[in-house]
């Protein structure tokens, strides 16, 4: 599975292992007018909260 990332600070594509899943996170600043979306690999053993499937953002491909 390949997850496509939309954040410039991470690789554009990330290989996920079989037990990993894709997640989507949304960052907003204090005035809620700066929204950045990112996709990546999530493993249940990690500490990333709230994994979300984001097929519209080309995750879970």
Curated annotation (Swiss-Prot):
InterPro entries listed in its UniProt record: Snake_toxin-like_sf
Tissue: Expressed by the venom gland.
Disulfide bonds: 3-22, 16-39, 41-53, 54-59
GO molecular function, one term: toxin activity
GO cellular component annotations of the record: extracellular region
Superkingdom assignment: Eukaryota
Entry keyword set: Cell adhesion impairing toxin, Disulfide bond, Hemostasis impairing toxin, Platelet aggregation inhibiting toxin, Secreted, Toxin
Chain span(s) of sequence motif Cell attachment site: 45-47
Primary site of residence: secreted
Compartments where located: Secreted
Family: Belongs to the three-finger toxin family. Short-chain subfamily. Antiplatelet toxin sub-subfamily.
Record function comment: Inhibits ADP-induced platelet aggregation and inhibits the binding of purified platelet fibrinogen receptor alpha-IIb/beta-3 (ITGA2B/ITGB3) to immobilized fibrinogen.
Name used for this protein in its record: Toxin S5C1
Species in which this protein is naturally found: Dendroaspis jamesoni kaimosae (Eastern Jameson's mamba)
């Amino acid at each position: 599975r390949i997850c496509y990332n939309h954040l410039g600070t991470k690789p554009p594509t990330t290989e996920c292992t079989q037990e990993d899943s894709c997640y989507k996170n949304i960052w907003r600043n204090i005035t809620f007018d700066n929204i950045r979306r990112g996709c990546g690999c999530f493993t249940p053993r990690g500490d990333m909260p709230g994994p979300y499937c984001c097929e519209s953002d080309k995750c879970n491909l």
